[in-house]
Amino acid sequence: MIPEGPASCFIIQNGYFCSKMRVLIISTYDLQGGAAIAAYRLMHALRKAGCDASMAVRTRLSDDPKVVQVGSEAMNRLHFYRERGSIFLHNRLSRENLFDVSIANSGVSITSLPEFKAADVIHLHWINQGMLSLTEIERILASGKKVVWTLHDVWAFTGICHHAAGCRHYEQACGNCPYLAAPSPRDLSYRGFLKKQITYA
């Protein structure tokens, strides 16, 4: 028997109700920035509709019991500075465009969380600045879980940038990135693009 309520919030197998759908929303923040606030509101909308929704974040600003902070503050800071430091060094010690790009070379482990293991659906939102590495995204995709990714910018399909600003290099393989101090055909954006192709394959 299928209970009353939004069918999308229940798992149905062979016509029988099995359980509430468990959704884990992944975001760098819960209440900082438009993407995070949208993800947080979605979690509550899903819960109101009958889903068992929760959220995993790098930086937790709310006291919401359904939001779990992943990693210690010290380790999360280390992931953040490792990524920004790599970009800073690659960009010839220039702070210009430092936050216009992300390389996702460092991040927390989501796949080891009990909330991840229990979830039916993993819903990615904005997951940069030391939240998820490309290696961890690859683990998420290989986990067998159903994955939804809401794109709040273009980073998921460009080499490294969050906003292409008219550049269309991502339609081929990036390279010669206008955000880099020393762009070249096989620069950081090109390598990021190739890494994402491997990650998503």
Language model: regions and residue ranges:
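Acidic, Ala/Val/Gly-enriched low-complexity intrinsically disordered segments
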Residues: 4-7
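Catalytic cores of nucleotide-sugar-dependent glycosyltransferases that transfer UDP/GDP/TDP-activated
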Residues: 21-201
